[in-house]
Amino acid sequence: MENKSIARSFRLLSQLMELHTENSFKIKTVANAALKIDKLPFSISSKTLEEIEQIEGLGKSTSAKVWELLQTGTMTDLQNILANTPDGIVDMLGIKGIGPKKILIIWKDLGIENIGELYYACNENRLIEAKGFGLKTQEEIKKVIEFKMAAEGKFLFAHSEHLAESLKAELLIWLTAIEPAPLLTIAGAFRRYCEIIEELDFVIGSDVAESVIEQLPAFASLPFEQKTENLFIAMSPFGLKIQVHVYPKSDFAVNLFKLTGNEAHVSSVLSLAGDGPFTDENEIYANAGLAFVTPELREGLNEVELAKTNQLPNLIVYEDLKGSLHNHSTWSDGVHTLEQMAVYCKDTLNLEYLGMCDHSRSAFYANGLNEQRIYAQHQEIDALNAKLAPFKIFKGIESDILNDGSLDYSDDILKTFDFVVASVHSNLRMDEQKATARLIKAIENPYTTILGHPTGRLLLSRKGYPIDYTKVIDACAANNVVIEINANPLRLDLDWRYHRYALQKGVLLSVNPDAHRMEGFRDMHYGVYIGRKGGLEAKQCLNAFTLTEITDYFNNQKII
């Protein structure tokens, strides 16, 4: 075992001891041992126990730990303390800029136990409420986490979007200098609006393909590391694989189609369309006797059968949205005031209404609203509605679903809201039976309007709790409860793979940004993308209702 590995184990032990507030003298002894071992000019693994005890600065107790590590590959003290520390907390120790003291606050005061939850808390502006944290620290932590996530080789769609579009623009300018009318499209999972991206595929069609292939290594924005006959591969500065494919224009359409995927869809369509050549993708589908299938639906499900009978859905577009539901303000853990959020929706986004759903009282970590503050917020909403009319703010709440499935307030409080988003935020470690029962009880509450982020997942960070999707969706259908598509790029929950079943059962979906600041409303674009992927039409989307329609909907939902 190398000195650095031994030192790393001692360093981890000292950090964990500090995290668990053990004796400061013992912590310092272990930390100093890590420094000492790391700087030794010889390999400590070649020494006997007696020789290790003679090393200045170690002593018998530390030497015994070193010897145990060399003989067994571990230390009892380290294993014992690891057993009492969540894995996610240990992972946090690797984040530059936060040490054990801050992690202890994150863990014990905020109830955050892994990096994914920490990243989400940064996005919700929750860290600045904790002792010793400011806005600058929060932003620095967020950037470090984003870098760490990137190192895994998988990226959120939203995190790859800017790079994809900027590279496309630069590449098009570069290509136009070679020929006047090049063809250029992004293919692959990005074109299909997949929530997770592992590579970006650019497909070029050119009348002078050989010349493009010859000159492409000089394209300054991409330092290519590999090249085959017509494929160039590079890595972005943050680790996203980028592939550029070059074809003659005559081969562009079929290769764009193949590289867009998915494999099952491509195979099904080409078995009907034949070998081509094809001038564009429309011709591929026409030759196959199919209606054109938009890229986001190409997942090898039932889209080919629907295309045969011209029964593909008329997919929702962003412009169909008339309002934004499930948002937060400074009343709980938002960055902007209620009025700022409303004016932004009205004047910048040209929406007709805003649903304000600050956190409920159990969400103490998010400054959740008690009964008195609910009354005060409703007074402010009444005043703003008079000021901003005909724009309307609906009185909502994101009510925690408690461990037994009940909501966070009495019926007397719940009936004061125009609508209620019911969400799970605590006790996430559940098996499928417990999670499903908990959700269904909340769904059956007559005051529940929308089921918020149904699985609690954080993409690339935290798996959602397991649920029986069929039972949960059936319960929503039976109780006339809307299911949220949480549009935050970290969530995109309800998963698009279950949209079709929900829509078949007559369940409305709602594209909700869960915005905690004005910029957060932009996430509705991602919700629309994922809704399209699931087959969502505007008529099946709650916040595509006009102000009159949604007012009637909420009024009809109310218990008399």
Model-derived regions: residue spans:
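Two-metal-ion RNase H-like nuclease active-site motif
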Residues: 186, 323-327, 398
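Short, compositionally biased low-complexity segments
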Residues: 3-7, 133-146, 243-245, 350-356
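Accessory alpha-helical DNA-binding modules that contact the DNA backbone or grooves
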Residues: 14, 26-233, 239-240, 249, ...
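Hydrophobic residues within beta-strands of alpha/beta enzymes
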Residues: 184, 354-356, 451, 483
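Charged catalytic cores and adjacent phosphate/nucleic-acid-binding surfaces used
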Residues: 193-329, 338-349, 361-391, 403-560
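Short acidic/polar active-site loop segments enriched in Thr and Asp
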Residues: 113, 182, 351-352, 449
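Charged, compositionally biased N-terminal leader segments and the immediate start
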Residues: 1-22
